[in-house]
């Protein structure tokens, strides 16, 4: 047991259901297939090499690095596919925000952006995202090796017990008190409570407010967010059931620097993909073994 959070939210990539299917979970090969199907579209609105690289590596970086055994896998086909996809985008410095910026809803609706990043901390957030796309969407998750859904939970208010503590019983009592007295309407509460009784109470409270609605605008796109419905609740519970990991930054900054430094030669056409991934593999392996 590492910690007991008091609240959580959900973090995932989403796309049109017609593009990504109805189930969560996909691989880098699946992402590449989507890109190949829509060669004129971007994966994300206002995408740059940096944003695409970080998004596609954020949840699955550990699959390329085995710190315990000092082994790296940056010469595998999945990583090569990743760099091939990233190569089509401008660098962060090359992207002209004044000239090239497009609001996400406009990019989604025109099908010039295929994916969005969705953060769920309220029962109606899924409804909001679906209306921004103006089409049925699927929480496809971040790409992995195929063994996971790629849908992650972000935790808040985590409490834990020091293994050297001489007062573990008292610590457990404090944790129990914290969970039981975590008020669902507290101004300090973000996302959803982890205690089922509190979660159910929150859902009941939201359903009781079903007649409430509010307007939401993003540039020239305006939508109406309806009060919580049973459909919203069902979609939320289904999404929670798909969560299979914690949203944490797996990326080692030094390894990311190695990747971005060496990949630049491929992006500029100075070296082949195989040459670049071989160099990344070599440098990364040396670094991991020196720091494991």
Model features per residue range: what roles?
Residues 1-18, 42, 138-152, 242-250:
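A structural signal for short loop-to-beta-strand junctions that line the ligand-binding cleft
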Residues 1-26, 47-69, 153-161, 254-263:
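Periplasmic solute-binding protein
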Residues 2-3, 40-48, 181-193, 286-292:
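Bilobed periplasmic-binding protein-like "clamshell/Venus-flytrap" ligand-binding domains
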Residues 30, 81-85, 166-178, 276:
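Short amphipathic alpha-helical coupling segments at ligand-binding clamshell hinges
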Residues 33-36, 89-91, 101-116, 120-121, ...:
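Short helices/loops that flank or line small-molecule/ion binding pockets
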Residues 69-100, 138-142:
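Glycine-centered hinge/linker elements that transmit conformational signals in sensory
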Residues 130-201:
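Extracytoplasmic/periplasmic substrate-recognition and gating elements
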Residues 153, 213-284:
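C-terminal capping/gating helix-and-loop segments adjacent to ligand/active sites or protein-protein/ligand interfaces
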């Amino acid at each position: 047991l590492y910690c007991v959070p008091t609240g959580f939210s959900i973090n995932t990539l989403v796309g049109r259901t017609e593009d990504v299917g109805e189930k969560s979970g996909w691989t880098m090969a699946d992402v590449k297939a989507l890109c190949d199907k829509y060669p004129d579209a971007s994966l994300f609105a206002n995408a740059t090499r940096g944003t695409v690289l970080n998004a596609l590596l954020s949840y699955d970086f550990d699959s390329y690095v085995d710190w315990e055994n000092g082994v790296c896998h940056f010469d595998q086909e999945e990583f090569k596919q990743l760099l091939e996809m990233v190569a089509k985008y401008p660098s962060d410095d090359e992207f002209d925000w004044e000239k090239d910026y497009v609001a996400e809803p406009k990019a989604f609706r025109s099908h010039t952006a295929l994916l969005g990043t969705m953060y769920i901390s309220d029962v109606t957030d899924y409804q909001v995202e679906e209306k921004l796309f103006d089409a049925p969407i699927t929480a496809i998750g971040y790409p992995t090796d195929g063994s996971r859904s790629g849908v992650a939970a972000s935790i808040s208010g985590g409490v834990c017990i020091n293994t050297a503590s001489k007062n573990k019983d008292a610590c457990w009592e404090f944790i129990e008190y914290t969970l039981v007295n975590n008020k669902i309407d507290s101004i300090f509460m973000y996302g959803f409570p982890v205690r089922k009784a509190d979660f159910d109470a929150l859902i009941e409270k939201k359903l009781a407010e079903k007649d409430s609605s509010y307007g939401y605008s993003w540039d020239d796109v305006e939508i109406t967010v309806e009060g919580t419905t049973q459909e919203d609740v069902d979609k939320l519970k289904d999404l929670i059931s798909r969560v299979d990991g914690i949203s944490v930054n797996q990326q080692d900054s030094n390894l990311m620097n190695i990747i971005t430094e060496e990949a630049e030669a491929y992006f500029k056409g100075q070296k082949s993909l195989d040459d670049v991934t071989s160099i990344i593999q070599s440098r990364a392996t040396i670094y991991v073994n020196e720091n494991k």
